[in-house]
């Protein structure tokens, strides 16, 4: 199931924190979007040819942190998918610091037709998601 996961390790920089040294949430969400895009490309559910026609958008997202992330913290972000429905697909993110899980995020993504501004089933445009058993969620 390793191919269902994507990772990024980074050290938090000064321009990513507030005046108290805590990581801005919008930077965290941007990193999530980046690793989700890399993951989608790796899984074959998004490519650059789709850019002007279709786009994956977050319909709902929930973030939980057990502790704040600070300037110069080294964090590992990871993401994976789970089984979806006809038009919505869950994605999970994990935040580790010092090899400890300090946060999680869950999101629901839908595919939009950019011209029609409507949800579209990925199957209708030839996208097939890989099987994603729930057991692999525990391995992150």
Regions found by a protein language model. Name each.
Residues 16-18, 69, 85, 99:
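Residues that cap or initiate secondary-structure elements
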Residues 1-58, 104, 111-140:
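Hot-dog-fold acyl-thioester-processing enzymes
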């Amino acid at each position: 199931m390793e191919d269902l996961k994507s990772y990024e390790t980074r050290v938090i920089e000064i321009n990513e924190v507030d005046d108290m040294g805590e990581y801005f949430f919008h930077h965290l969400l941007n990193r999530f979007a980046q690793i989700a895009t890399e993951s989608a490309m790796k899984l074959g559910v998004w490519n650059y040819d789709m850019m002007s026609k279709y786009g994956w958008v977050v319909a709902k997202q929930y973030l939980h942190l057990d502790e704040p992330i600070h300037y110069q913290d080294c964090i590992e972000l990871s993401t994976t998918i789970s089984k979806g429905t006809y038009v919505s697909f869950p994605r999970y993110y994990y935040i580790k610091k010092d090899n400890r899980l300090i946060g999680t995020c869950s999101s629901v993504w839908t595919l939009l037709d950019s011209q029609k501004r409507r949800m579209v089933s990925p199957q209708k445009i030839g996208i097939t998601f890989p099987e994603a058993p729930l057991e692999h969620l525990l391995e992150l």
